[in-house]
Amino acid sequence: MAESTFGVSRETSPGPEREPAAATEILGHALELGRRYTADLVEHGERLGLIGPLEVGRVWTRHVLNSALVAPFLQAGGRLADVGSGAGLPGLVLALARPDVEVTLIEPMERRTDWLRDESARLGLTNVTVLRARAEEARDAGPFDQVTARAVSALRTLVPITAPLLRAGGELLFLKGARVEEEITAASKVLQKHRVRDIAVLELGVGLLPEVTRLFRATVGEAS
């Protein structure tokens, strides 16, 4: 909503989004933790620079549930790295939804890693490790079975910094926008170089959320 004072407009925060009916189906047993996380993100997210002022009005559908849709694709008992975790999207949401998975949240900014540690503690999550680092600096923490990322960068930039974190045969799980097919085409040489194969783009949340969630899913083969 725009508010005008002496002809100058500025954006004002909308009210918090009400919990959608789809939250129960998507989060299941983790619904209460999802509610607590969402409430904390609404309360602190804008002040800490984790989400923009307009995102409060769509925090459930565009952020929390969008992230939680990836949970069924995680390997049971596996190790997951979330690159550029920021507010914990998708990594912290996946950690609360899948307590059987060890999740490492990789984030270079101190105020964000402070938030991630504090929020993990508030939620009582014991399967989370927070690592203040760039992806390129996090290789010693691996190898991981899977790597996630959301709103970090285009594939041609993202693949070279994430593929080295994986074990041979590990998976890339990236939340992407409507132009993901164009990104795949633009990254063809990079994908070949890093032995990325079995590429699929899955549309998640159809009929559950207002916007389709696109998941780029691929396997990283063994190095020669």
Where are these regions (language model features)?
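Conserved SAM-binding loop of SAM-dependent methyltransferases across substrates and taxa
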Residues: 87-100
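S-adenosylmethionine
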Residues: 98-224
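Conserved beta-strand/loop positions that form the S-adenosyl-L-methionine
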Residues: 83-85
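Compositionally biased, intrinsically disordered/low-complexity regions enriched for serine, proline
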Residues: 11-13, 17, 87, 105, ...
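Short hydrophobic/aromatic-rich motifs at helix boundaries and adjacent loops
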Residues: 38-43, 88-89, 130-131, 157-160
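Residues at secondary-structure transition points
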Residues: 55, 90-92, 183
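Class I SAM-dependent transferase core
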Residues: 1-81, 97, 111-128
